[in-house]
């Protein structure tokens, strides 16, 4: 499921897919179920999501991802 009904912002399938991909990749890196769940918590607005961005070397696109988080 790409869309989290708890998110109250704009529904944009492309943004959700992009944010969800970060969490999927982070889970694949660590293989810990709590990583995937925590990463998606609070509509991606959390420390685990930000740490995943850094661990996946997506830091140079950090602002773009955070903007997506604020949108959803």
From Swiss-Prot:
It is found in: Secreted. The keyword tRNA processing does not apply. It holds the Pfam family Crust_neurohorm. Gene3D superfamilies: Crustacean CHH/MIH/GIH neurohormone. One of its GO terms (biological process) is glucose metabolic process. The modification D-phenylalanine is found at residue 3. Disulfide bonds join 7-43, 23-39, 26-52. One of its GO terms (molecular function) is neuropeptide hormone activity. The modification Valine amide is found at residue 72. Its main location: secreted. Keywords: Amidation, Carbohydrate metabolism, D-amino acid, Disulfide bond, Glucose metabolism, Hormone, Neuropeptide, Pyrrolidone carboxylic acid, Secreted. GO terms for cellular component: extracellular region. It comes from the Eukaryota. Stereoinversion of L-Phe (in CHHA-I) to D-Phe (in CHHA-II). The modification Pyrrolidone carboxylic acid is found at residue 1. Hormone found in the sinus gland of isopods and decapods which controls the blood sugar level. Has a secretagogue action over the amylase released from the midgut gland. May act as a stress hormone and may be involved in the control of molting and reproduction. PANTHER family: ION TRANSPORT PEPTIDE, ISOFORM C. Belongs to the arthropod CHH/MIH/GIH/VIH hormone family. This is Crustacean hyperglycemic hormone A. The lineage of its organism: Eukaryota, Metazoa, Ecdysozoa, Arthropoda, Crustacea.
């Amino acid at each position: 499921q790409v869309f989290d009904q708890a998110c109250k912002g704009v529904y944009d399938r492309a943004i959700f897919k992009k944010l969800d991909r970060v969490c999927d990749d982070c889970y694949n890196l660590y293989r810990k179920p709590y990583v995937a769940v925590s990463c998606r918590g609070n509509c991606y607005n959390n420390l685990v999501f930000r740490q995943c961005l850094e661990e996946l070397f997506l830091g140079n696109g950090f602002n773009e991802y955070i903007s997506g988080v604020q949108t959803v």
